[in-house]
From Swiss-Prot:
<keyword id="KW-0445">Lipid transport</keyword>
<keyword id="KW-0732">Signal</keyword>
<comment type="function">
    <text>Plant non-specific lipid-transfer proteins transfer phospholipids as well as galactolipids across membranes. May play a role in wax or cutin deposition in the cell walls of expanding epidermal cells and certain secretory tissues.</text>
</comment>
<keyword id="KW-1015">Disulfide bond</keyword>
<feature type="disulfide bond">
    <location>
        <begin position="39"/>
        <end position="55"/>
    </location>
</feature>
<dbReference type="GO" id="GO:0008289">
    <property type="term" value="F:lipid binding"/>
</dbReference>
<keyword id="KW-0813">Transport</keyword>
<dbReference type="Pfam" id="PF00234">
    <property type="entry name" value="Tryp_alpha_amyl"/>
</dbReference>
<dbReference type="GO" id="GO:0006869">
    <property type="term" value="P:lipid transport"/>
</dbReference>
<dbReference type="InterPro" id="IPR016140">
    <property type="entry name" value="Bifunc_inhib/LTP/seed_store"/>
</dbReference>
<feature type="disulfide bond">
    <location>
        <begin position="56"/>
        <end position="101"/>
    </location>
</feature>
<feature type="disulfide bond">
    <location>
        <begin position="29"/>
        <end position="78"/>
    </location>
</feature>
<protein>
    <recommendedName>
        <fullName>Non-specific lipid-transfer protein 2</fullName>
    </recommendedName>
</protein>
<comment type="similarity">
    <text>Belongs to the plant LTP family.</text>
</comment>
<feature type="disulfide bond">
    <location>
        <begin position="76"/>
        <end position="115"/>
    </location>
</feature>
<dbReference type="InterPro" id="IPR036312">
    <property type="entry name" value="Bifun_inhib/LTP/seed_sf"/>
</dbReference>
<feature type="signal peptide">
    <location>
        <begin position="1"/>
        <end position="25"/>
    </location>
</feature>
Length: 120
């Protein structure tokens, strides 16, 4: 089970690196997935779970790294791609993650988010 989880995580990271929008964004999906790797158990947990401190540290680090509109759009696309790749994803936990970590982002972490509309 642990080996298959590790393999799934490696596959997820590889998919995100290949799919990452390379255009003008300096923020890569590898960075996003590395920052948010500690969040995987929370994202698969039942409703009302609490994210572990390393997860929130990664969320805050990612927020600090995404300083330009292209970076924020790239991070959004990476999050969207990752959300679609996580088996047993609890969409309520994904949407609640920023707030539970004490940060605010102007979009929902979801497979249906239109990342091209992010402008700030």
């Amino acid at each position: 089970m642990a080996t298959s989880m590790k393999l799934a995580c490696v596959a997820l990271v590889m998919c995100m690196v290949v799919i990452a929008p390379m255009a003008e964004a300096a923020l890569s999906c590898g960075t996003v997935s590395g920052d948010l790797a500690p969040c995987l158990t929370y994202l698969q947990a039942p409703n009302n779970a609490s994210p572990p401190p390393p997860c929130c540290a990664g969320v805050k680090k990612l927020l600090g790294a995404a300083t330009t509109t292209p970076d924020r759009q790239a991070a959004c696309n990476c999050l969207k791609s990752a959300a679609g790749s996580i088996s047993r994803l609890n969409t309520n936990n994904a949407a609640a993650l920023p707030g539970k970590c004490g940060v605010s982002i102007p979009y929902k972490i979801s497979t249906s988010t239109n990342c091209n509309t992010i402008k700030f």
